[in-house]
Each structure stands twice: as structure tokens, then as C-alpha cells.
Design a protein with these regions (language model features):
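Glycine-rich phosphate-binding loops of nucleotide-dependent enzymes
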Residues: 2-253
């Protein structure tokens, strides 16, 4: 099975504090790998290393078999590695169409123009409608982001990442701040969109263990900067002590 994204013996220190310690993980083609752990476990540092926002103190990160050393997040996105952030990264005054257009233009390396003109470009408009349709936002194209529900804002944020045509996408808490009733709907939409768009691998950072159990192929658990476990869901949730370490309490699954 082809490994798309991996870390090899990666460590990251901030001064005397070691946030990650000798972490080696891989995301293979066709996998959704969830990264879990208590606050301060190193999840955010790991995602920032995977996307080129941080450089490791030791070890290396590889994307499609090549080291990303010296490659920034924008160039990585051009090569097919996209990220949707935990905190919604959209401008409230822009419409849904304008938000997706900005992502499409950055991917196609077209010269920036007024967003209103971009949405009038037939090729760009077709791509906007395609992406919006996948995420159930086509009826909201002319709506400013500020007027969207929290769930719709999450979908728009992820839709913008999908507009980059990624091979691998990192989803950082994609359902945070969303009602429990909407969480599974959002996850199902994301996975269906990934399959439709030809996304080859997904990294999911998630606190909700119900979602992790339902959608993961593998679960990587971090604790104090180390890999505590790298297991399929069945084996992970069969270990009450492991679950207690990750979420701070025992729970039956």
C-alpha cells in the first residue's frame, strides 16, 4: 500500500520543552487516520509539521515519498496537501461563491482580480458550483459567510480546502462548535466529498471519540509528545486503559 504522508523519527522542541519525541507515523492510500490525545499531547504540533508550518528539530516529514524540508505550506498545497483549520478560516464579508473562488484561483495560479469578476469567469464559476454542490452549499452561493450557520461555515471552510484538488487533506477538528446532531452529517459529507474528488488520504484531528470510532481506519494516539498507540479502531477501543489515557475517563464502546 502506497504511503502518502509520513513522519520518520520526528521530534520538535520549543526551547527546553519537547512537544514531540521520536514520532513515526504514516498515512497510506485510501486511509482515514485519526490523531487523538489529551490537550497538550502534541496534536497541533504534529499537524503543523505535516503541513510545513513548522520544521522538525529532528527527523523528517515526507509527502508522496519526498522530504518536505524547505517547502512551505503554500507550495505543499500546490502539490496536493491541504488543510482545513479548527478555527474557521473564512472572511465573514465574502459570499460563499467568492470564498470558493479565492481557493480556486490560488490553485490555478491565475492573476488576482476583483472577486466579483472572478465569479463571472465561466470556468471558475463552473468549479465554484461543482465544489459548492458537493457540500450542499449551491443554494447559498450569494450568501455572505457571516449569515451562514455554524455547520455551513465549517462546510465552507472545508470546501475551500477541497477546491485545491488535494491528494491528502488534514481536517483539524472539523466538527468543533457544531451540534451533536449535525456532526455525523458533516463527517459523512466530508468523506463522500473526498471520494468524489479523488482525495487519496485523510488525517483527522478529533476529540469526539464517537466520530473517531465511526469513521477511522486507524487511530494514532499521542500522549506527552509520544505515540502511545497506532491501531485499528477495534483494537483501540478494546483497551479501556488506553481510552482513559486519551480522554481522561473510561468509556464502553
Amino acid at each position: 500500500m502506497t504511503v502518502l504522508l509520513e513522519t520518520r523519527n520526528v521530534s520538535k522542541s520549543y526551547g527546553a520543552f519537547r512537544a514531540l519525541d521520536d514520532v513515526s507515523i504514516g498515512i497510506a492510500q485510501g486511509e482515514l487516520v485519526s490523531v487523538v490525545g489529551p490537550n497538550g499531547a502534541g496534536k497541533t504540533t504534529l499537524v503543523n509539521l505535516l503541513t510545513g508550518l513548522l520544521k522538525p528539530t529532528a527527523g523528517e516529514v515526507l509527502f508522496m515519498g519526498k522530504s518536505i524540508a524547505g517547502i512551505g505550506p503554500v507550495e505543499l498545497a500546490d502539490h496536493g496537501l491541504a488543510r482545513a483549520f479548527q478555527l474557521i478560516q473564512i472572511f465573514p464579508q465574502l459570499t460563499v461563491a467568492e470564498t470558493i473562488a479565492a481557493a480556486v484561483v490560488s490553485r490555478q495560479k491565475k492573476r488576482w482580480r476583483l472577486l466579483s469578476r472572478l465569479t463571472a469567469d465561466k470556468a471558475i464559476d463552473a468549479r465554484i458550483r461543482e465544489v459548492a454542490g458537493v457540500f450542499g452549499l449551491r443554494h447559498r452561493l450569494d450568501t455572505v459567510a457571516a449569515a451562514l450557520s455554524q455547520g455551513e461555515k465549517k462546510l465552507l471552510d472545508v470546501a475551500s480546502a477541497f477546491a485545491l484538488d488535494p491528494k491528502v487533506i488534514l481536517l483539524d477538528e472539523p466538527t468543533s462548535g457544531v451540534s451533536t446532531a449535525d456532526k455525523h452529517g458533516i463527517m459523512k459529507t466530508l468523506i463522500a466529498a473526498a471520494e468524489r474528488a479523488g482525495v487519496q488520504g485523510i488525517v483527522l484531528v478529533e476529540h469526539d471519540m464517537d466520530l473517531v470510532a465511526a469513521y477511522s481506519h486507524r487511530i494514532v494516539a499521542l500522549s506527552e509528545g509520544k505515540v502511545l498507540a497506532d491501531l485499528p479502531p477495534g483494537r483501540f477501543f478494546a483497551d479501556p486503559g488506553l481510552i482513559e489515557t486519551v480522554i481522561g475517563k473510561r468509556r464502553a464502546y
